[in-house]
C-alpha cells in the first residue's frame, strides 16, 4: 500500500455552495490554497 504524504500547503480561504434538490440537502466547502495558486483562489472570491 502507498503511504500518504501530509499536505504542506495552507488553506487560506474557504468557499462554499449550498445544494438543494427541492429542499436543502447540504453544503460543499472547498479550501483554497491562496499562497500556492493565488490567481486561481482569487477567481473563487
Swiss-Prot record:
Reactions it catalyzes: [protein]-peptidylproline (omega=180) = [protein]-peptidylproline (omega=0)
EC main group: isomerase
UniProt entry tagged with the keyword Zinc: no
Keyword set, alphabetical order: Chloroplast, Isomerase, Plastid, Rotamase, Thylakoid
Coiled-coil ranges per UniProt: none
Enzyme Commission number: 5.2.1.8
Summary of the function given for this chain in its UniProt record: PPIases accelerate the folding of proteins. It catalyzes the cis-trans isomerization of proline imidic peptide bonds in oligopeptides.
Assigned protein family: Belongs to the cyclophilin-type PPIase family.
The protein's name in its UniProt record: Peptidyl-prolyl cis-trans isomerase TLP20, chloroplastic
Species annotation: Spinacia oleracea (Spinach)
